Amino acid sequence: MLRVGVIGVQGAVSEHIEAVKRAFERLGVEGEAFWLRRPEQLNAIDAIILPGGESTTISRLMQKNGLFEPVKKLGEEGLPIMGTCAGLILLAKEVEGAVEGQRFLELLDVRVNRNAYGRQVDSFEAPLKLSFSDEPFPGVFIRAPKIVELLNDKVKPIAWHGDEVVGVEQGNIIGLAFHPELTDDARLHEYFLRKAL
């Protein structure tokens, strides 16, 4: 049985839990998706999702709740972790526009610009190309970060908006600038969960 924790300190948690449940069904696997708030919940976990929200707040609360270092260590050891929007920022090695003193997990060798797509009013939806599917994916961008640079060839693009890379993977780590959990399309959650099977 797969156990998937969604970091539940702030952000779009319930939508990710529902998307993971849809992905379990599509994959035909038994699984449990839950809000991850305390370090002891990391025992016997198979995958972690870092949701959207506000990256500075999520980073601070993860540190306060004792989740930051254990999650970083699990990611370094190969546990599958997916970050969406603010979660991508937390995973990034380098962040433009970071708040002073903000800590990052630094599990993805990318440079991101924190609020490249502007304010809430600059949010948009657009069809995205995926590396593993011919069908376009409905991309929902809300004050999204931008992937400015892939820092080495270990980082592979998996999603594009036109010519722009908006999703990447590096080993078992996935970072997405958009919100797949705000659609009914579970393909990206399914792709992520395959890393934990």
Curated annotation (Swiss-Prot):
GO terms under biological process: glutamine catabolic process; pyridoxal phosphate biosynthetic process; pyridoxine metabolic process
GO molecular function, one term: pyridoxal 5'-phosphate synthase (glutamine hydrolysing) activity
Binding site for L-glutamine: G53, E54, S55, R114, I142, R143
Residues forming the catalytic site: C85, H179, E181
Origin: domain of life: Archaea
Key word Transmembrane helix present: no
Catalytic activity: aldehydo-D-ribose 5-phosphate + D-glyceraldehyde 3-phosphate + L-glutamine = pyridoxal 5'-phosphate + L-glutamate + phosphate + 3 H2O + H(+); L-glutamine + H2O = L-glutamate + NH4(+)
EC assignment: 4.3.3.6, 3.5.1.2
Matches recorded under InterPro entries: Class_I_gatase-like, PdxT/SNO, PdxT/SNO_CS
Pathway: Cofactor biosynthesis; pyridoxal 5'-phosphate biosynthesis
Function: Catalyzes the hydrolysis of glutamine to glutamate and ammonia as part of the biosynthesis of pyridoxal 5'-phosphate. The resulting ammonia molecule is channeled to the active site of PdxS.
UniProt similarity note: Belongs to the glutaminase PdxT/SNO family.
Assembly notes: In the presence of PdxS, forms a dodecamer of heterodimers. Only shows activity in the heterodimer.
Protein name per its UniProtKB record: Pyridoxal 5'-phosphate synthase subunit PdxT
Gene for this chain: pdxT
